[in-house]
Amino acid sequence: MVRKNQEWPDEGELIIGTVYKVLNYGAFAKLEEYHGKEAFIHISEVSSGWVKNIRDHVRENQKIVCRVLRVNPKKGHVDASLKRIREDQRTKKIQHWKIEQKAEKFLELSAKSLGKSLNDAYDEVGYELMDIFGDVYGAFETAADDGAKSLTDEGISQEWADAITEIANKNITPPEVHISGYVDIETFVPDGVDVIIEALKAAEDNGDEEEEIKVQCVGAPRYRITVKSTDYILAEKALKAAADRCIEIVEASEGNGSFLRELDS
C-alpha cells in the first residue's frame, strides 16, 4: 500500500479509496494512501444529479477518487465527495497513484538489495524522499537522470542513494525527444556533390555528445535534420549546431546555405 508522509489527508485533497460498505444514505471507503483510515461519502456527495439508487453510482470493492471535505482526527472521521471532482482531475489522480505504486515497488527492491524491509525503507528514507522530491517516484527519476550524487547532495545516505540509483537505472527509461529542422544547401563548384556529401556527414557528426543526429534528403537542395535526445533544450542546441556545421562547409566552397526550424505550411 502506497503511504503518505502524514497521518491524515488535508481538506481539499484528492484521495484514492476502496469502497467496502454501501448503505442507503452513503458509502464507506478505505483510504489507499492512509493506512487504517477511511472516508464517508454522503449520498448528497455521490453525484451532482438526483440519486435514486446509490448503488447505481457506487458499489463494494470499487476504486474511487474523492475530494476531502472535512477531517476530524479526534473522531477519526474523513468526509469526502465524489461529485466535486472534474474528470481530468480524477484521471490525473489515478495515474499518479499508479506511478506511486510502481515507485513503492522500486523502494522495496532497493530495500531488499540492502537486506531490509519495506517498512525499514519508509522509516529510513521513504518519507524523507517525499519531503525532498515531492513523491518517491520523483526521487527515482532524479537518480536515473543525475545519479546517486543527486540524492546524497540532498542528505540521503550513500547506502540508500546507491541502492535507489541501481534500481532506477534498471527500471526507468529516460523519455525521448525527437525534433527536426531543415537546411537548404547548394554549391556550383565542380566537386559540388562531394562538398554536399561532406556537409551532410558533418551535420551527423556530433562528436562525443549523446544526441543522435540523422540527415535525410527531402528533395535537393533541402535536407531534413532529425535529432533524438533525452532533453529538449539539448536537442535544440544539437539541431542548430548540426545545421551550422553543414552550412559552414557549403559556404566555404562558394555555396549557399540556410536553416529552417520549421517549414511554412
UniProtKB/Swiss-Prot annotation:
Residues 12-83 form the S1 motif domain. The keyword RNA-binding applies. SMART domains: S1. Pfam families: EIF_2_alpha (PF07541), S1 (PF00575). Keywords: Initiation factor, Protein biosynthesis, RNA-binding. Disulfide bonds: none annotated. GO terms for molecular function: ribosome binding; RNA binding; translation initiation factor activity. Heterotrimer composed of an alpha, a beta and a gamma chain. Belongs to the eIF-2-alpha family. eIF-2 functions in the early steps of protein synthesis by forming a ternary complex with GTP and initiator tRNA. This is Translation initiation factor 2 subunit alpha. It comes from Methanobrevibacter smithii (strain ATCC 35061 / DSM 861 / OCM 144 / PS). The lineage of its organism: Archaea, Methanobacteriati, Methanobacteriota, Methanomada group, Methanobacteria. The gene is eif2a.
